[in-house]
């Protein structure tokens, strides 16, 4: 059944991420509608496409949004600009802002893991594409055993890494690493990001290593990961395990040597995840962008429904 709730949203940034997000919302029968797409370059690209589709646009950047007649109806703003836009006017208006860039303003949010804890938070950071793909796996392992260390390696196609992605790569790695701890629950973490120039372009691939204290029940970890993958797949259909979860046990007589921390005894869990982007705007190899736009749309839909129910209960 089509939801009766309709929440107009504004998208800041008319590049690949902003345009794909717009197309996803336009083709959805969910609670979101596109009230505005804001960028800096009227054509070619997202703004020209939005105008053809009847979406209100502005080429004046963030400063142009409050001046638009549609601004008063906007309930949620997606910030898909490379470094994050100033938001004093947005805060005054009381809109919810979802950041699709590594500039951390609000708490980290990964919908499959912790969105329900932040439905009333005015500003959420959606981490990175790598974080959206890997943090759920670390969190799933952490629900069975204590993750003392998590390391993730994400490889993306060079064609899916635009200039903004390349310019912000250090900040993206820092944000992903932080989210592995704050959302994933790992005590220590490291994130590695690789831009692969192969042609034809590769699909997004993520390898997640978790060092878990003690000899944990492997079946429970596999079940927890499978359940988490199912949750992520509900909003990113192209997200899947590449192969079965791998386990390796290290004992006191044969520990795993880790630089700076010494020997580790316990279980190493290795998970391989692959992401294929889908319709309508992104090519299949742009899984890193797919993770961001799909997570953003899922988060906004849940927040919109929550706000509607909260407002209804208050009247």
Swiss-Prot record:
Residue positions annotated to bind NAD(+) are 14-17, 288
Provide the transmembrane region boundaries.
none
Cysteine disulfide partners in this protein:
none
Regarding protein family, the annotation reads:
Belongs to the acetaldehyde dehydrogenase family.
Record carries keyword Magnesium: no
What NCBIfam families does UniProt report for this protein, alphabetically? ac_ald_DH_ac, PRK08300.1
- Which keywords does the record carry? NAD
Q: Does the keyword NAD belong to this entry?
A: yes
Q: Which GO MF terms are attached to this record? A: acetaldehyde dehydrogenase (acetylating) activity; NAD binding
- SUPFAM superfamilies found in the cross-reference section: Glyceraldehyde-3-phosphate dehydrogenase-like, C-terminal domain, NAD(P)-binding Rossmann-fold domains
- The source's domain of life comes to Bacteria
A Pfam family assignment: AcetDehyd-dimer
- Which Gene3D superfamilies does the UniProt record give? Dihydrodipicolinate Reductase, domain 2, NAD(P)-binding Rossmann-like Domain
Indicate what this protein is called per its UniProt record: Probable inactive acetaldehyde dehydrogenase 1
């Amino acid at each position: 059944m089509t939801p009766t709730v309709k929440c107009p949203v504004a998208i800041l940034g008319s590049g690949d991420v902003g345009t794909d997000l717009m197309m996803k919302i336009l083709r959805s029968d969910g609670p979101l509608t596109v009230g505005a797409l804001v960028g800096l370059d009227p054509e070619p690209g997202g703004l020209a496409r939005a105008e053809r589709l009847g979406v209100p646009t502005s080429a004046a950047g963030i400063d142009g949004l409050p001046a638009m007649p549609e601004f008063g109806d906007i309930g949620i703003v997606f910030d898909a600009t490379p470094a994050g836009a100033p938001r004093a006017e947005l805060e005054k208006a009381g809109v919810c802002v979802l950041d699709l860039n590594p500039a951390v303003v609000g708490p980290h949010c990964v919908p499959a893991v912790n969105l329900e804890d932040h439905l009333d938070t005015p500003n959420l950071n959606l981490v990175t594409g790598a974080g959206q793909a890997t943090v759920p796996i670390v969190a799933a392992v952490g629900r069975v055993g204590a993750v003392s260390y998590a390391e993730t390696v994400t490889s993306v196609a060079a064609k899916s890494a635009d200039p903004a992605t390349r310019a912000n790569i250090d900040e993206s790695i820092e944000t992903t690493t932080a989210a592995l701890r704050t959302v994933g629950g790992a005590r220590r973490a490291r994130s590695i990001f690789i831009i692969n120039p192969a042609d034809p372009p590769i699909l997004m691939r993520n390898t997640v290593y978790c060092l878990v204290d003690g000899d944990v029940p492997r079946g429970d970890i596999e079940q927890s990961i499978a359940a988490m993958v199912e949750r992520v797949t509900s909003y990113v259909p192209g997200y899947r395990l590449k192969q079965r979860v791998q386990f390796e046990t290290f004992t006191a007589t044969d520990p795993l040597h880790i630089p700076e921390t010494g020997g580790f005894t316990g279980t190493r869990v290795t998970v391989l995840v692959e992401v294929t982007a889908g319709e309508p705007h992104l090519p299949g190899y742009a899984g890193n962008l797919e993770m961001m736009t799909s997570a953003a749309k899922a988060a906004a839909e849940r927040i919109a429904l929550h706000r509607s129910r909260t407002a209804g209960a208050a009247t």
